[in-house]
Amino acid sequence: MKRALSPLLSIALVIAAGILCAQNPEKDAPYKNPKLPVEERVADLLGRMSPREKAAMLSGAGWMESQPNARLGIPAIKMADGPMGVRNWAGSSAITNAAATAPVLATAFPAGIGMGASWDVELVRREGQVIAQEVKALGRNMILAPTVNINRQPLWGRNFEGYGEDPYLTARMAVAYIQGVQSEKVIPSVKHFAANNQEFERHRIDENIDVRTLHEIYLPAFQAAVQEAGVWAVMNAYNKVNGLWCAQNPFLLSDTLQKRWGFKGFVISDWGSTYSTAATVAAGMHLEMPGGEAMRTWFAKPGTQKDGNGAGWLTAEKVLAAVAGGQLKQEAVDDATRRILRVMFTAGLFDNARTGGGEVDTPEQRGVARTASTESIVLLKNAGGALPLDASKIRSVAVIGPSAAIARTGGGGSSLVRPKYSVTALDGIKEAAGARVQVGYALGVSMQGDDASEVSPQARAHLSNQAVELARRSDAAIIVVGYSSKLESEGFDRPSMDLPTGQDELIEAVAAANQNTIVVIVAGAPVTMTKWIGRVAAVVEAWYGGQEAGHAIGDVLFGAQNPSGRLPVTFPKQWSDSPAYGHYPGENLHVAYEEGVYVGYRGFDKRNVEPLFPFGHGLSYTKFDYSGLKITPAKVAAGKQVVVTARVRNSGSRAGVEVVQLYVHDVRSSVDRPVQELKGFRRVALEPGEARNVSFTLDQSALSFYSSAKDEWVAEPGAFEVWIGASSRDIRLKGTFALTR
């Protein structure tokens, strides 16, 4: 006969069992076990969630956080704006053009266009890593970056955020940035999917783009982000593409992103870009932002949304109602929840949810920012070797202009970072010039939006006269002009390519007073220079260079650094030369991309239009020679690779970096193709007299076009030419090979 356990012993065993369960929660809840595969953890957690808990995952809890779940221990995804650094996330200040008011300080890197001008993949990867480190240090776990939209035309207000006009260059930079961010277990969200190429009516505009143009120009960076970098999140755009909002566009989200490319992460809406419940979830959009009170407060503001309410469609109540009413399948809700959880597990949010307490803006991070600022600078013109300035031979320098004594670290909108410090061009020039050189300063003209912009005509004339007189008595005049975060920003487009508020006239006046006038441009896109380009000695494109821009400008002007930047966009002589001219901003809320694949240099080549400065252009303080082009094999079978090798030699007297560019020309095609397309590039650092072999590998994708008829990429047999050069208009070597069947 068995003896019954005593009451005290029974209680003790129950307590012991409870302690063991508390010490080993993974036993009863496998999703908490970090040793299990991600998919097993996702499946276990998803199976424990109620329909309401699943539905709640599809909308945010506030302005910059997803919905947490206390019962199951699901943490919130905590977001921060990017891509040039960690942007403020506090309330509605996140979408103003002013610097963030909350005390969120982080390293400010150059704008994306400047990073594109570096043509330095490893540098961009390191930038992504540093930004991710600061995301974690500031208590967040997701960065809304990178921006990979193509610079279709020079007036777009967010040209500065992207990497330029070329899909190949943009894709290389996107992959590197994402790899850097994800290496730190921070969630990036590549944006804006797809074709966000103008701010004018961005909430309502319908963009009509043929399928070939989409696949060849506007989608490659996103495809590379998914298939090469394995990006964890994608942000949809505000606009419509071919009649459907991007947030509920099955062609983009379901057919292309998820089915064709195999995307396993989640799609997050741009803030206020959703217009339906069932159609949005069914199309493949998974997390609506913002949510909660932040959503209601923001979208209650007059004029915030001009075409219905762009948020509040994926609340738990609406999602459950759509499922109950038969408009939405539960499987679609499960898929959205599964995707969000998959990313959260992959990023370690369940296992190491604690963030904050790390360092921001460390000496090492500042060093990366300074390198980035330096490499972003492009020397556009250098007549007679006007640069670099020799501090041992000049006694005085005039520094003039509305952007000389103000650090314009970035363009406006959600990307503008508030750094702990910033270096102005004036301070950087003073430091680089040294104590022996007298550096004078004059404003010259005030820029709209600056404190002194509202001045009388008499005061404006006085400012200009002061600048001219300073230039006249100086050995060299450096005039720093351009745009600002209040004039070039998310939310609106530029009215023209012209420099604003009398800056052209100031340059002309200063150049007339000093033949050694150097123009430094601080902007995010090309500007018109035809009035004065022939009258100045040198032109430097500094973009928005981040917090270290001043140091970088000074170092380049005085020769401590040899400029190595190359243009990631074509600089037209005037706006009317742009391929998109006449097809922007559209009519009746429709814009037709009638230029097709002929964006940027492709369009200039097609129409044989001479640009002011071509894509890929950038001068150096040394010279480079090209020789020894080899292409093997001479005949390549479909699916095989071609190896291209060339020799580059520094034939000048100082060390420098050449950016060797490879373009492919299809000799004969069944469809009209661009004259040339960038398919490879290498940064090569060379000492004086040093030479190196540079190699490229071309696969079938480098030879292909997108066939609208076949709905697939096609590489046709025949002859192809390889063009190697220093820019799209400075080709040094040419060779031919054949693609066989």
Predicted regions, residues:
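Short beta-strand elements
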Residues: 730-741
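Bacterial N-terminal signal peptides that target proteins for export
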Residues: 1-9
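Bacterial N-terminal signal peptides
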Residues: 9-18
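Glycoside hydrolase catalytic-domain context in secreted enzymes
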Residues: 18-705, 712-714, 719-729
